[in-house]
Design a protein with these regions (language model features):
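DG-centered beta-turn motif at the end of beta-strands
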Residues: 92, 163, 207-211
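Short hydrophobic-aromatic micro-motifs
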Residues: 86-89, 158, 205-208
Length: 211
């Protein structure tokens, strides 16, 4: 019995050591990426105070399940951070089950709370990735598409992790914002893709998932 307990203790200590090393590596990588990120969006939320915006917006959300009676793995939230900033969150959990829906809903809920406390999207997404990766569940991951519309300057900012491309339609033109980054919690190496696009009156933004 003592030998078995000793082996279990040794195994637990080794696992803790590996997790601690992973945590340190993750934090170092996150700090490096934040230091080298685009300075024009690092303090975006903090820079915008309440005021009368120059532009107005309207939105429509459409969802459809793959099979009749199945549960969508997608979750989304659209909300105002200030009078000048509108946030859009879309997450796609793995599969078409209640669990996948719960995971994506948890992701967008946490992300909204981070942003409400003026935590920058890239920092929040790295934190969410660490939390999911640290749980060590191979089948637990979700995409995350974060968008912010600046109603004062007429700009669209996006941060993407494993999600589909975003399309901006302007009359006969279509602008595509691609994404090639991994989902949150899926792989040890994680990074966030960021983009900015100038907007004009009557532009339409399509933020989609693959279902």
């Amino acid at each position: 019995l003592n030998e078995r307990l000793s082996l279990q203790f040794h195994h637990g200590r080794e696992m803790f050591s590996l997790q601690l090393k992973d945590f340190i590596k993750h934090m170092e990588q996150m700090m490096y990426e934040l230091q080298h990120s685009d300075s024009s969006v690092k303090s975006l939320i903090a820079q915008h105070q309440d005021g009368q915006p120059r532009f107005e917006y309207a939105y429509h959300a459409y969802t459809k399940t793959k099979l009749k009676g199945s549960k969508s793995g997608d979750s989304y939230k659209i909300f105002s951070l200030t009078n000048q900033l509108v946030a859009i969150l879309l997450s796609d959990g793995m599969g078409h089950s209640l669990k996948s829906n719960q995971e994506s809903e948890r992701i967008v809920t946490y992300m909204k709370q981070f942003m409400k406390y003026s935590i920058q999207p890239e920092t929040a997404m790295h934190t969410l990735h660490y939390l999911y990766a640290f749980q060590n569940h191979d089948d637990m991951y979700a995409t995350l598409d974060v968008g912010m519309i600046d109603l004062q300057e007429g700009k669209y900012y996006c941060w993407k992790a494993g999600c589909m491309s975003t399309y901006i339609v302007r009359k006969n033109e279509i602008f595509k914002l691609n994404s090639f980054s991994p989902p949150i919690g899926a792989m040890p190496q994680f990074y966030v893709e960021m983009g900015t696009h100038e907007l004009k009156s009557n532009d339409m933004i399509f933020i989609v998932s693959d279902g």
